[in-house]
């Protein structure tokens, strides 16, 4: 089985090395195509305004000056002689929960794999940003191999990917695996305005304390309770529940 690895933290990210160790417990045919530099928060973006520069790091490791989406496209359509059987994107430094998935380059790597017709899983590791920036990968390294093997054999409809988040706890403190829905988070987002050396303003987006809906059954609730969250996500963003309501309003508004 051929496995393609990508991420959004870049080719030198520790989480990518962790993911490669995980993948090698499943198959010996593992390829890495990852961004040359950090592409966090770029979501499912393509590079269209400049060329894609590819650097071969080793026989099966490639760095691309592009986004995670670019990486999966290049791997599937250029680098590999045949499509992989599985795309793993991660392991991201920090969880990708709730509204995170709309911004996440990690999830986007799995989205693009799904668009290419490949079984795809996004993998992220929660951690507390305030505690010295240290990330413990033990949970992912311990539990991901068996979990991925199981998820590989689950029949999924076309256009569905899986978003896996590991809790921030000791590996032996994990309270199981939960299939979850996407929760709702507020990011406490603010704009930090500063002045450069020439007196011109510039800005940073600053994330504050997160808060949200921690209802049972959601990804954020599961991770908070030290459970591994597995959320199936659909590429089809249509809200079927309001189609008829809108159609009725249009009929009544136009007299149709």
Swiss-Prot record:
Instruction: Write out the entry's keywords from A to Z.
Output: Cytoplasm, Hydrolase, Metal-binding, Nucleotide-binding
Query: Secretion signal: which residues?
Result: none
Q: Does the keyword Nucleotide-binding apply?
A: yes
Q: Which InterPro entries match?
A: SurE, SurE-like_Pase/nucleotidase, SurE-like_sf
The enzyme's E.C. designation: 3.1.3.5
- Which Pfam family, just one, is annotated for this protein? SurE
Q: Which residues bind a divalent metal cation?
A: 8-9, 40, 92
Q: Does the keyword Nucleotide-binding apply?
A: yes
Q: Which domain of life is it from?
A: Bacteria
Q: Name one GO cellular component term.
A: cytoplasm
Q: How is the cofactor bound?
A: Binds 1 divalent metal cation per subunit.
A molecular function (GO) term:
5'-nucleotidase activity
Cofactor names from the entry are: a divalent metal cation
**Subcellular location field:** Cytoplasm
Reactions mediated catalytically: a ribonucleoside 5'-phosphate + H2O = a ribonucleoside + phosphate
Q: Which cysteines are joined by disulfide bonds?
A: none
Q: Which family does it belong to?
A: Belongs to the SurE nucleotidase family.
Q: What does this protein do?
A: Nucleotidase that shows phosphatase activity on nucleoside 5'-monophosphates.
Write down what this protein is called: 5'-nucleotidase SurE
Q: What organism is recorded for this protein? A: Sinorhizobium fredii (strain NBRC 101917 / NGR234)
């Amino acid at each position: 089985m051929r496995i393609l690895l990508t991420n959004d933290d870049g080719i030198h990210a520790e989480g990518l090395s962790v993911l490669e160790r995980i993948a090698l417990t499943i198959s010996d045919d593992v390829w890495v195509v990852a961004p040359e530099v950090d592409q966090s928060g770029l979501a499912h973006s393509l590079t269209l305004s400049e060329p894609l520069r590819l650097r071969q790091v080793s026989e099966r490791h490639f760095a691309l000056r592009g986004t995670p989406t670019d990486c999966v496209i290049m791997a599937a359509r250029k680098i590999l002689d045949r499509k992989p059987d599985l795309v793993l994107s991660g392991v991201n430094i920090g969880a990708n929960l709730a509204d995170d998935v709309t911004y996440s380059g990690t999830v986007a790597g799995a989205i693009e794999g799904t668009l290419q017709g490949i079984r795809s899983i996004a993998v992220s590791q929660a951690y507390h940003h305030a505690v010295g920036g240290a990330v413990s990968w033990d949970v992912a390294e311990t539990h991901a191999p068996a979990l991925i093997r199981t998820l590989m054999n689950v029949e999924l409809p076309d256009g569905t990917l899986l978003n896996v988040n590991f809790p921030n706890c000791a590996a032996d403190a994990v309270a199981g695996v939960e299939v979850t829905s996407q929760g709702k988070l507020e990011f406490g987002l603010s704009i930090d305005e500063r002045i450069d050396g020439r007196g011109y303003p510039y800005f940073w987006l600053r994330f504050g304390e997160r808060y949200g809906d921690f209802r049972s059954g959601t990804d954020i609730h599961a991770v908070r309770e030290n459970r591994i969250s597995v959320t199936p996500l659909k590429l089809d963003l249509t809200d079927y529940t309001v189609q008829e309501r809108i159609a009725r309003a249009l009929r009544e508004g136009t007299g149709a």
